[in-house]
């Protein structure tokens, strides 16, 4: 998936690119946006770019009736404050507690059909890391932040993830080409699965492009920062295969030549 910062996911739920098309059997960002835009309830608007001489106007399909008159090309300071106030509840992170972990879902939907079609109700590594960064910036949320990070660490330490790392370390060619994206370390899972299994489609792991080294790099970066600050201690390191998974992930990224490997 492209553009999965917490801000981008928020905006994706409000408006989407009107030129996106679904391609092939694999679910992509284009097909997700196409599903959202096909509802028929969107308001079609055109906006001036900041540099109209160089860049043309851009088009947005706005799905939120609440915000359709609030999205503008330019804002005053008071308008920005008003927008922050209007979206205050929307921007709050909702944590999902399970016996096997604490999760930040990419998004939630009122109807199961949209959730099933987009899979934004799954747990995404990158989105959860952005959520963790928001939580850890507030001392009052430090306990919840650590729970989220440890849950992601446990996901990266599952037997399936460790096997993917070991397989690529042994044979980096497993990542060559487009059809082998499922061989990469996975970056998304079903929070309802006690073993943090893949999102399922017709009883099988859904085909997805998991080649997202930027998410893996952010994960390692934040993990190291948590160690440096003492947030993560020796007891945390010693649980299960956490230490093993970190060592394997570093070797995996090296064997995958992450610096030249294209992200999805």
From Swiss-Prot:
<keyword id="KW-0732">Signal</keyword>
<feature type="lipid moiety-binding region" description="S-diacylglycerol cysteine">
    <location>
        <position position="17"/>
    </location>
</feature>
<keyword id="KW-0564">Palmitate</keyword>
<keyword id="KW-0472">Membrane</keyword>
<dbReference type="InterPro" id="IPR008928">
    <property type="entry name" value="6-hairpin_glycosidase_sf"/>
</dbReference>
<feature type="lipid moiety-binding region" description="N-palmitoyl cysteine">
    <location>
        <position position="17"/>
    </location>
</feature>
<keyword id="KW-1003">Cell membrane</keyword>
<dbReference type="GO" id="GO:0005975">
    <property type="term" value="P:carbohydrate metabolic process"/>
</dbReference>
<protein>
    <recommendedName>
        <fullName>Uncharacterized lipoprotein YgeQ</fullName>
    </recommendedName>
</protein>
<dbReference type="InterPro" id="IPR012341">
    <property type="entry name" value="6hp_glycosidase-like_sf"/>
</dbReference>
<keyword id="KW-0449">Lipoprotein</keyword>
<keyword id="KW-0997">Cell inner membrane</keyword>
<feature type="signal peptide">
    <location>
        <begin position="1"/>
        <end position="16"/>
    </location>
</feature>
<dbReference type="GO" id="GO:0005886">
    <property type="term" value="C:plasma membrane"/>
</dbReference>
């Amino acid at each position: 998936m492209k553009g999965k910062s917490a801000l981008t996911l928020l905006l994706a739920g409000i408006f989407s690119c009107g030129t996106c098309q679904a391609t092939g059997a694999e679910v992509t960002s284009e097909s997700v946006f196409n599903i959202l835009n096909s509802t028929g309830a969107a308001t079609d608007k055109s906006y001036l770019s900041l540099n109209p001489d160089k860049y043309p106007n851009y088009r947005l399909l706005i799905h939120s009736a609440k915000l359709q008159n609030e999205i503008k090309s330019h804002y005053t300071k008071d308008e920005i404050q008003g927008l922050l106030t209007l979206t205050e509840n929307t921007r709050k992170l909702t944590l999902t507690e399970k016996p096997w972990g604490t999760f930040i879902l990419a998004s939630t939907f009122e109807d199961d059909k949209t959730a099933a079609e987009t899979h934004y109700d799954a747990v995404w590594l990158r989105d959860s890391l952005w959520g963790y960064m928001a939580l850890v910036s507030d001392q009052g949320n430090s306990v919840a932040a650590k729970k989220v990070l440890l849950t992601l660490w446990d996901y990266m330490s599952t037997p399936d993830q460790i096997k993917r790392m070991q397989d690529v370390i042994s044979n980096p060619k497993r990542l060559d080409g487009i059809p082998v994206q499922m061989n990469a370390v996975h970056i998304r899972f079903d929070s309802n699965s006690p073993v943090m299994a893949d999102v399922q489609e017709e009883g099988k792991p859904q085909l997805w492009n998991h080649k997202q080294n930027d998410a893996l790099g952010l994960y390692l970066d934040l993990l190291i920062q948590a160690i440096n600050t003492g947030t993560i201690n020796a007891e945390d390191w010693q649980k299960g295969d956490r230490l093993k998974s970190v060592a394997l992930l570093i070797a995996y990224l090296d064997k995958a030549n992450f610096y030249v490997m294209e992200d999805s």
